[in-house]
């Protein structure tokens, strides 16, 4: 039961007089919405206030949700409210003051337990060892868990919805084929797939373009399943899956290099070394495609506290200009840049719906905390793309042959279906000097 709730409830109501949401407490008391119908936030335990008190902002609210001490009847609506409704009254200091008042009113005397799904890495960032630990935290939840929401190809990166009403499977096939087209893959070539995941690009490239592929990942379970999928398709003679850091690859050069959804894990301190390694790994005249998430605004934080602790430890989506400058300083020539922000928002919408459709199995495989982490993350990430906080880019480059600049045409757009037959939802970006 609430011990001395009334003064606090009056203070909360006064601090938030215009509320597009309701708050319901664990004893049934409710602070109703005052500005139309909206989501209801359910405070299931005083620990919710303690989490916010100890870590005001995104991390405290995330911990409260993951632990189950805070819930919301409409998660999408709740995130939209938090994104759009940011009154000056609820700046961080006010959050702390209200949380402290709640702790006193409800007799909170101990720090709450931090959810087990949280990770806080130690040591210097972006060493080989720490990067391996970060990847294990994200991917080793289980292959079966990811299969609940990914498409049948197990492609864990942005799909491309060029036709408007295609399935997730079709959109992922379009993306994989687009990567092959941009790399200009030819039969008999040797290709490197950095961050190969469960092998979707390697399998597609080998099956449809007759190339051989070396794919690398830092996740042992991921590599095991990728090898199994390769063997099932009779491609073991053309695809090699390794557990290896990109910095340790020493058997280049390759005819083409694809890095899909990996650059956001590299970090600002390592981006130049990463770009130099790409140059070392591709033959003169060969192509490189760098596909990854980036920030849209210079000066935005690299990754939120919740994402750092629960999803992508040490994740650092950089601004496009920072990535492109590193690639060009290393010696690559940029030919084409394309933005797929709307497509990633749609991809995340599909993933979130599929996870919800398999919620009981997700809880069985990953546990309730981990499942809540992913339900929150998939929706929060989608909001980031929809509101313009983040985007995803494909940067197509080549390594010049000696001092001569490589000749590679820059198309108006290389999206599937961009021949006028269907509207395009993302636009090719002109190549700008990177400085």
Show where each model-derived region lies.
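Feature captures hydrophobic
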Residues: 1-166, 170-172, 178
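Conserved class I S-adenosyl-L-methionine
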Residues: 187-195
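Conserved SAM-binding loop of SAM-dependent methyltransferases across substrates and taxa
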Residues: 198-209
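Conserved SAM-binding loop
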Residues: 226-227
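A short acidic, Gly/Pro-enriched loop at the edge of an enzyme's catalytic core
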Residues: 247-257
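A short glycine-rich, Lys/Arg-flanked "PGG" loop and its adjoining helix->strand segment in the class I
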Residues: 272-285
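Conserved beta-strand signature within the Rossmann-like core of class I S-adenosyl-L-methionine
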Residues: 285-293
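Substrate-binding/catalytic lobe of Class I Rossmann-like enzymes that use SAM or dcSAM, i.e.
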Residues: 293-405, 412, 416
